[in-house]
Every structure is written in structure tokens, then in C-alpha cells.
């Protein structure tokens, strides 16, 4: 597919692996994201794409299995889901995706580099293969 003002592809090369992330604007409220492993790493290691979201701490997460989770100091991760929602958006995803909270950054302003939960991110990890995996992000 040729890039356009509504569709583009990002190619990422790391550790000898080549991956593509393709983005397409569906409408004013929806974005399609797909990932594909173009070339595996020479040493056979797994490839994973990570999508990072800045959370709204006051908004709980709702999952396709009917459960919910708060964005607190308590860590959790979920797999086997087909979607989850947070604040004013919803993400459909393949069941192989993993959703993690909290993923803490390195904080260069603390002596030991630790970060507080207020700095945490919500991360969706997609195991990559030659078969494309697709997500759909919808903002209401």
C-alpha cells in the first residue's frame, strides 16, 4: 500500500529483525493498527511490538471478559481478551496481546532511577509473526 494522508507504514529494524507497523485512519474516531514481522531475528528470538498509552488515573479499565481494573499501585496483566476500554477510548485486539499495568519508566531525577505510579504507562504488547495482527483504536 502506498502512503497517503490517511494511511502510512513504519518499518522497524532491530537485532536483525524487520517489522512493520501499518496505520490507517478509518474515520474521525477510529484508527486501525496492524503489525507484521517481515524478517525474523537471525538468532530466532521472539519479536514483540509495544503500544504505550498515557493513562487517566481516575478512569478504570473495562475488559471484554466483563472484569475491570483500577490504575493503582497494584500490578496486573491480562491476556486472552478481545478488547478493553479506558477513559473515552476502546481498543480491539488479538487474544495473543498482553496488557500490563503499571509499566514504570526510568526516572533520572531519583537516586536509584525508580518511578512513582503517577509516571506509569499502560502497555499493550503484541507478539509479532509473519501473519499480520490487527488492532482498532476508537475514541468516543
What are these model-predicted stretches?
Residues 1-42:
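Extended, loop-rich substrate-binding clefts of extracytoplasmic carbohydrate-active enzymes
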Residues 2, 20, 39, 58, ...:
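Glutamate identity and glutamate-enriched acidic tracts
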Residues 78-80:
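Short, surface-exposed, charge-dense and proline/glycine-enriched linear segments
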Residues 13-15, 47-49, 82-140:
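Beta-strand-rich recognition/accessory modules
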Residues 30-76:
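Acidic (Asp/Glu-rich), glycine- and aromatic
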Amino acid at each position: 500500500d502506498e502512503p497517503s494522508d490517511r494511511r502510512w507504514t513504519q518499518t522497524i529494524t532491530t537485532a536483525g529483525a524487520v517489522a512493520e507497523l501499518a496505520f490507517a485512519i478509518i474515520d474521525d474516531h477510529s484508527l486501525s493498527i496492524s503489525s507484521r514481522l517481515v524478517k525474523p531475528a537471525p538468532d530466532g528470538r521472539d519479536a514483540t511490538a509495544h503500544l504505550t498509552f498515557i493513562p487517566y488515573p481516575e478512569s478504570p479499565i473495562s475488559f471484554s471478559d466483563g472484569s475491570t481494573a483500577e490504575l493503582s499501585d497494584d500490578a496486573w496483566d491480562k491476556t486472552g481478551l478481545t478488547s478493553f476500554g479506558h477513559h473515552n477510548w476502546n481498543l480491539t485486539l488479538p487474544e495473543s496481546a498482553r496488557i500490563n499495568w503499571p509499566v514504570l519508566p526510568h526516572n533520572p531525577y531519583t537516586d536509584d532511577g525508580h518511578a512513582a505510579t503517577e509516571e506509569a504507562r499502560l502497555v499493550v504488547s503484541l507478539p509479532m509473526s509473519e501473519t499480520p495482527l490487527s488492532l482498532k483504536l476508537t475514541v468516543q
